[in-house]
């Protein structure tokens, strides 16, 4: 068994990882609950509410599945069979793909919302929510089809008699694929990453250009260099811009660490960094979204004041 199988002996790594997962589950649960309450109370939904609520649900499920898999990495376990290994790993990878698809479509939707009426993208505003939902479903089904090879390559470690497998957890391992299969799968994944991250970069650049143009117009109208009070649309755009930048950086770092891990199968340090980095975006994003909600900010502020005055 390789060095990764001894990760359960590293208490600091285990505590750090479960702390990250716990914070992420709490944040996404609160954000999802907020959107559910907002919906049932009859508040007029914004176009971005559906994808943000969907993203929080995806991240919540992904972190829960990650927590289950982590128990088999960091805690001594009796062992899972092939069916459990295949189901958990496939579900986790599918949820990660859904996260990427939804984040990309959210950036495109915000670019459409921000577009002035005279721009061609403004024509899609009325049906943007429906179109984005269809795009998310299509991309998700496509990615789940790409990941179907996991039903063949994931197996229970107890069934293995060779040493060149890739460690997933104490019970589950990834069998090496043939050169042709590995090349096809890698090509499809690269195309998916380039397409979706390319959409994010394009929509983000477009929104930055619109915000800069709007600020210049506002300064000309005011006749002063002082900035105007930020509009709700601009606040939402700035939030999504920050998330998109963060997501792209995390995706690049994730790819670098993942490639390094493929080259150094027995490096437990590389694997520890890999499993930590994979969940940073899912952990941080709900708190960034909640920071733009005035009702939530005021609620937390009053709670802090109440605790301080106790």
UniProtKB/Swiss-Prot annotation:
Residues 1-16, 71-91, 153-193, 260-269 are extracellular. It holds the Pfam family V1R. Residues 38-49, 115-131, 215-238, 291-310 are cytoplasmic. Disruption phenotype: Mice lacking all but one V1ra and V1rb gene (12% of the V1r repertoire) show a lack of chemosensory response to a subset of known pheromonal ligands and changes in maternal aggression as well as male reproductive behavior. Keywords: Cell membrane, Disulfide bond, G-protein coupled receptor, Glycoprotein, Membrane, Pheromone response, Receptor, Transducer, Transmembrane, Transmembrane helix. Disulfide bonds join 85-172. Glycans are attached at residue 159. The keyword Zinc does not apply. SUPFAM superfamilies: Family A G protein-coupled receptor-like (SSF81321). It is found in: Cell membrane. Its main location: membrane. It is a multi-pass membrane protein. The chain crosses the membrane at residues 17-37, 50-70, 92-114, 132-152, 194-214, 239-259, 270-290. GO terms for biological process: response to pheromone; sensory perception of chemical stimulus. One of its GO terms (cellular component) is plasma membrane. InterPro entries: GPCR_Rhodpsn_7TM, Vmron_rcpt_1. One of its GO terms (molecular function) is pheromone receptor activity. Putative pheromone receptor implicated in the regulation of social and reproductive behavior. Belongs to the G-protein coupled receptor 1 family. This is Vomeronasal type-1 receptor 47. It comes from Mus musculus.
